[in-house]
Design a protein with these regions (language model features):
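N-terminal accessory segment detector
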Residues: 1-130, 139-155, 162-189, 193-223
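Phosphate-moiety recognition in structured ligand-binding domains
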Residues: 133
Length: 223
């Protein structure tokens, strides 16, 4: 198969154009690391996996030692990170006039999966209000327990907030199945909502946060 050069500045699919995040540092990485024939790209995975494990372990330690206030600080940091990345990706966002809102949503989700989570996916537009995708492989699937995946939800929350602010399109999200629970894919369902509607995504994240603290409370009582 012919290797097609990747444009590090822009990401284009059909009628949609986004910026690629971290473009300047990616250029440097290609020049100083990937251009070296002795450099194994799998090293990036191992480094990134270490950092992802550090994040979930840091969250658990903060929850154990500082409780709800500490948990809230970590979660807010992740939301803000998601917003920053989303704003960078959407800064020069372009859509052709005939593009439907759900097409924009579907392409943004593809960018999230492929470029932010490094995950191959199969997208599907169901109708003018809904779309979904099947994530075929997740970098965390062999290292995170199912409950650990909650840490990523706050980054997604920030991404969705940035998306609504830039495009005016309000969207909610739901995972219907995940690989760490034994499913073949992680399935991600998206639907358009009114701008005033609270996201079920955020509500469920709050439930998981409360559950994490409750687990710690039960564990301490049983020790």
């Amino acid at each position: 198969m012919e290797n097609i050069p990747i444009e590090d500045q822009k990401w284009r699919r059909g009628q949609i154009t986004f910026n690629r995040h971290f473009a300047a540092s990616i250029k440097k990485m290609r020049e100083m690391a990937l251009s070296n024939k002795d450099y194994d790209p799998a090293r990036l995975f191992k480094w990134g996996q270490m950092m992802s494990l550090a994040l979930i372990r840091a969250l658990k330690a903060v929850e154990k030692n500082l409780g709800a206030p500490g948990q809230k600080v970590i979660n807010q940091v992740l939301i803000e990170l998601g917003r920053e990345i989303g704003q960078e990706v959407l800064r020069d966002f372009v859509r052709l006039p005939q593009t439907k809102d759900i097409e924009v949503v579907s392409k943004f989700v593809t960018y999230i999966n492929e470029e932010i989570w490094a995950s191959p996916e199969i997208p599907l537009i169901i109708n003018d209000q809904e779309c979904l995708c099947d994530v075929l492989w997740c970098p965390h699937q062999d290292h995170y327990q199912a409950f650990d995946c909650r840490v990523q939800r706050y980054i997604v929350q920030g991404l969705l907030e940035a998306f609504q602010e830039k495009t005016g399109i309000a969207v909610d999200a739901q995972f219907t199945q995940i690989i760490p629970k034994g499913a073949k894919t992680c399935q991600f369902h998206m639907r358009l909502i009114s701008p005033q509607e609270e996201r079920e995504w955020n509500k469920y994240s709050a439930q998981l946060a409360a559950k994490a603290l409750e687990k710690l409370k039960e564990k301490s009582q049983n020790e």
